[in-house]
Amino acid sequence: MDILEQIIATKRRELAGMMAPKRSLKKALADSPTGIIAEFKRKSPSKGWIHADVRPEEVVPAYAAAGAAALSILTDEPYFGGCLEFIRRVRPLVDIPILRKDFIIDPVQLYQAAEAGADAVLLIAACLSREDCAALTAEAHRLGLEVLLEIHDAAELDYIRPEVDVVGVNNRHLGSFVTDVQTSFDLIDGIRRRITAPLRASALRRAEPKLVFRQTCPKNNFGPPAGEATGPIIISESGIGEPETVRALREAGFRGFLMGEHFMKNPDPGAALADFIQAI
């Protein structure tokens, strides 16, 4: 093999991660008994360093072994002490979905996420216009990435579109970084209305067959095919630290819970997650 052939072979290997089938965050949350997205976060703007010296190779596999449904990895460096390389380093170590958590404002960041081995990306409504959010969602899907759309208040409810895979309520105010889990309870009904309206419209369109079809098929054949997705999964993010909070959120209709700081401030984040799961 000459040098050019070696270079081409290397490039093919580099592209393999981007082209490989992705794991579904939405399905993982729907199927999980815990619904916990465990986050690797070393630092935050409000708390400073939470766990400065820890390596993702130590924490992420322990999260997976403890029963996490999926993983969230901060890749912002200045404010959260993360980097994209963290995803590359842990991707071969776990089989559950990885969310790239960052402030994504440009398609280039989607290409980075896909190349690094992420399965899903975070899109923050507060960072994007509605048009840009829709365009980034479409491009993410073209790359095989799922989208977690994050909202913070009722004004952002109209960012929710049927094609979004997961809708998350961030209980942390991005201006003050103060957390209040009540935000999730306040928004859940509005989210449900936004999700179910297009589903109802779609079902009505399906139930408008031609007359001859109506005469030859039983009524109970109308509607979505078996196994078809029924809209985005709803999750709650930030400020969750007690098992009772998870139980209350689950009762309200949330299927997933993104948690990081509660585990990362522990000397053994994986063990902290295992204990938390036992308690819920």
Protein language model features and the residues they cover:
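Residues marking helix boundaries in flexible regions
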Residues: 189-192, 196, 222, 278
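Conserved N-terminal beta1-alpha1 strand-loop-helix module at the mouth
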Residues: 1-98, 105-108, 139-163, 174-184, ...
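Thr-Gly-centered strand-to-loop micro-motif
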Residues: 74, 100-101, 123-124, 170, ...
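Glycine-rich phosphate-binding active-site loops on the catalytic face of alpha/beta enzymes
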Residues: 112-132, 169-177, 254-273
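Solvent-exposed, charged amphipathic helical/linker segments at domain boundaries
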Residues: 128-144, 152, 169
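Active-site regions of enzymes building and remodeling cell-envelope glycoconjugates
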Residues: 165-167
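Short, low-complexity intrinsically disordered segments enriched in small and basic residues
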Residues: 196-230
